[in-house]
Amino acid sequence: MESNGVPMITLSSGIRMPALGMGTAETMVKGTEREKLAFLKAIEVGYRHFDTAAAYQSEECLGEAIAEALQLGLIKSRDELFITSKLWCADAHADLVLPALQNSLRNLKLEYLDLYLIHHPVSLKPGKFVNEIPKDHILPMDYKTVWAAMEECQTLGFTRAIGVSNFSCKKLQELMAAAKIPPVVNQVEMSPTLHQKNLREYCKANNIMITAHSVLGAIGAPWGSNAVMDSKVLHQIAVARGKSVAQVSMRWVYQQGASLVVKSFNEGRMKENLKIFDWELTAEDMEKISEIPQSRTSSADFLLSPTGPFKTEEEFWDEKD
């Protein structure tokens, strides 16, 4: 199924995923009618891939929008959609993975997910989601048993595929050493200001699809940056191509062989973001983008602890690898 010209990517497990999805993180209108209407509008204009998570607190609104889209005839079947959600760190324990997924399904009013991701490579003491995580709650993840529980979720049919998010090459190696079903996706920050070249090469060699988040700098998030949208290089390319800076950034990610999720509640920008697949950046454009200074926008500070598995950003991201 293609919608509004969005290509389908075949993951290593054989299932197909729209190359572009709508993100649902960090909305300022969580749990409101406006949030539901934004998701409904996204379906109406052509989005078929939605990326949510237990921690985003957007699952229930997305579920309501899906139900309404079916009632309105915007889609004929839930099978037309590709729904991704994520396992929160406090549930990243072998005995809590399946209950957490089942809770997400209840929130979404769905019988299955298309993709379920481990949100971060770290666990927390079990409990409800909190914005301020006590440092003594941060624990190392038992990759072997947690991933085995993820595999069980797929085997039981509650999700069609499983993957990870915010994993470095080193952490992927640790997880895959004991995996019976390899992860099909690693969702990470990637943009013209964070190329992730080494990670992309590793994932490609291991048949793991990169899904890029924060493609436009995560503007509006507490850790957001204007580096992408203010880039003179990207502005020059955008003017030359008759495109927006956002479209250039998204197109660059796609031309690197990655899929992506982006978020907008503005109908005009929703439509604009879909229009990145019928044109290409030139080799000269790509060369210019390759020279843009690199910096990470995402911060792992909230998951760092003197007594936890990761004490510094460098340890969390394995930046020195």
UniProtKB/Swiss-Prot annotation:
Residue positions binding substrate: H119
Localization, UniProt? Cytoplasm, Cytosol
Comment on activity versus temperature:
Optimum temperature is 28 degrees Celsius for reduction (forward reaction) and 30 degrees Celsius for reduction (reverse reaction).
Q: Does the keyword Cytoplasm apply?
A: yes
GO biological-process terms attached to the record: alkaloid metabolic process
InterPro entries per record? AKR, AKR4A/B, Aldo/ket_reductase_CS, NADP_OxRdtase_dom, NADP_OxRdtase_dom_sf
Upon changing A25V, the result is: Increased neopine production and slightly enhanced velocity for forward reaction. Slightly enhanced velocity for reversed reaction
Described purpose of this protein according to its UniProt entry: NADPH-dependent codeinone reductase involved in biosynthesis of morphinan-type benzylisoquinoline and opiate alkaloids natural products. Reduces codeinone to codeine in the penultimate step in morphine biosynthesis. Can use morphinone, hydrocodone and hydromorphone as substrate during reductive reaction with NADPH as cofactor, and morphine and dihydrocodeine as substrate during oxidative reaction with NADP as cofactor. Converts morphinone to morphine, and neomorphinone to neomorphine.
Protein's UniProt name: NADPH-dependent codeinone reductase 1-4
Q: Which organism is it from?
A: Papaver somniferum (Opium poppy)
